[in-house]
Amino acid sequence: MLCIQTSNLTKKYGSSLAVDGIDLEIKSGQVFGFLGPNGAGKSTVIKLLTTLMPPTKGELTVLGIDAAKSPLEIRRKIGVVLQQPSYEMTLSVENALDKYGMMWDVDKKTRKERTEELLTSFGLQEIRKKKNDDLSIGQRRRVQVAREFMHDMDLLFLDEPTVGLDPSARRELLDF
């Protein structure tokens, strides 16, 4: 089964062509990535594939769902870690995870269980009470990835999750 399929996916910003007619077929279970220099359109493609922005033209199907007809249905089934992260700086790590679960309507018991699982799985137990404002960039990235696992998703998109990390922090994040 294909989890992502595009046909002639194109994005223009005014007269500037950012993405030029991409055709993709990505199978379920496949790990896939984009390589290219700064400004090549990698982040734009991810925003198109995650329905965070509409294409100028072309077709997109994610998990069998037509993006033109049901972009919100797609958003409910995917996780997205963007290059420019968003944080609630005043929340502790565990409260940030819990709040994200609340946003996805995860019941309280499940949120508590998942928070504990994710704190352990992502090596966040020792910093669970720290506020996001007090975390290193690497710790913030781990929290950002962990919070996507608070809801049931079928597909995870990562847009440069290791940007700004030193080599040891990069390896640590990728090991999760």
Model-assigned labels for residue ranges:
Residues 58-66, 73-74:
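Conserved ABC transporter NBD signature motif
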Residues 50:
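Helix-to-loop junction immediately C-terminal to a conserved catalytic motif
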Residues 145:
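Hydrophobic anchor residue at the start of the ABC signature
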Residues 156-159:
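Catalytic Walker B motif of ABC-type/P-loop ATPase nucleotide-binding domains
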Residues 98, 102, 109-127:
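Conserved ABC ATPase "signature" region
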Residues 131-135:
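Conserved ABC ATPase signature
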